[in-house]
């Protein structure tokens, strides 16, 4: 994803008419290059470790699988000197000191393999998440209005240019999972359904017409890509 962000950033700079937006993209590019060279995060907010597991039904694991994942997160954040943001209780606010627990989602699949994807999710973007229970009569137009309005309300808070994950359908908890899962899809891979692939492009254009721009300084580069699941 990082390489695709680099490529899309270069394309965005070429197409960006606003000088301040171009300059901001250059600064973001310099930061990304420095992070790659020094093996450091591009932002101090290294967020929560969201772990997606595809676990084969023929896999047998001795011991606690979740405990092993938490230990991996603990070591990664400690050895990598990443900021510890996670609290043991959301209201009493005591920091766990090692960024655990992780948010773990397990999806059972056929076979005897196990695939683990770790996606650190910064809270600057996480806090901009929204959910809406649309009425059937709202239709696709209501869906599009909600998506564009969500980005408009968020403004500069998620540090644009953003990558947007959108979940649609299912229950309250399922749609949030779909939105997270959508962020794992490579930026250059459209939805396999032509209807949703076209909708992704339509929404991308509408969002970039909002004029929020890089870091909220204006311009047409508000969103590098989005995925609907």
Annotated model-derived regions:
Residues 174-210:
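Catalytic or ion-translocation cores adjacent to nucleophile or general acid/base/metal-coordination motifs
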Residues 113-189:
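Conserved mixed alpha/beta catalytic, RNA-binding, or beta-rich assembly cores of soluble enzyme
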Residues 38-57, 158-175:
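Conserved phosphate/anionic-ligand binding catalytic regions in large, soluble enzymes, centered on
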Residues 2-6:
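Short, small-residue-biased leader/transition segments that mark boundaries at the very start
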Residues 47-110:
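A generic, well-ordered mixed alpha/beta core segment in the N-terminal half of proteins
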Residues 7-9, 20-25, 39, 79-93, ...:
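Flexible, glycine/charged-enriched surface loops at secondary-structure junctions
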Residues 108-110, 115-117, 219-229:
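C-terminal edge-of-domain segments
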Residues 7-55:
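N-terminal low-complexity or amphipathic/hydrophobic leaders
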């Amino acid at each position: 994803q990082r390489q695709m962000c680099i490529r899309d950033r270069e394309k965005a700079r070429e197409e960006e008419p606003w000088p301040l937006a171009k300059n901001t993209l250059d600064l973001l590019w310099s930061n990304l290059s420095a992070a790659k060279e020094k093996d450091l995060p591009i932002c101090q907010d290294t967020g929560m470790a969201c772990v997606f597991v595809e676990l084969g039904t023929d896999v047998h694991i001795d011991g606690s699988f979740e405990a092993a994942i938490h230990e991996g997160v603990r070591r990664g954040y400690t050895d990598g000197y990443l900021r510890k943001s996670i609290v043991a209780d959301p209201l009493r606010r005591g920091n766990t000191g090692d960024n655990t627990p992780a948010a773990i989602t397990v999806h059972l699949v056929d076979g005897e393999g196990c695939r683990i994807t770790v996606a650190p999710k910064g809270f600057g973007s996480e806090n901009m998440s929204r959910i809406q229970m649309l009425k059937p009569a709202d239709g696709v137009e209501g869906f599009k209005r909600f998506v564009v309005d969500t980005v408009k309300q968020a403004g500069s808070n998620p540090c644009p240019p953003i990558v947007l994950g959108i979940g649609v359908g299912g229950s309250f908890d399922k749609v949030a999972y779909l939105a997270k899962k959508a962020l794992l899809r490579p930026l250059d891979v459209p939805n396999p359904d032509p209807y949703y692939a076209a909708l992704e492009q339509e929404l991308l254009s509408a969002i970039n017409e909002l004029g929020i721009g890089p870091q909220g300084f204006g311009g047409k580069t508000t969103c590098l890509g989005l995925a609907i699941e």
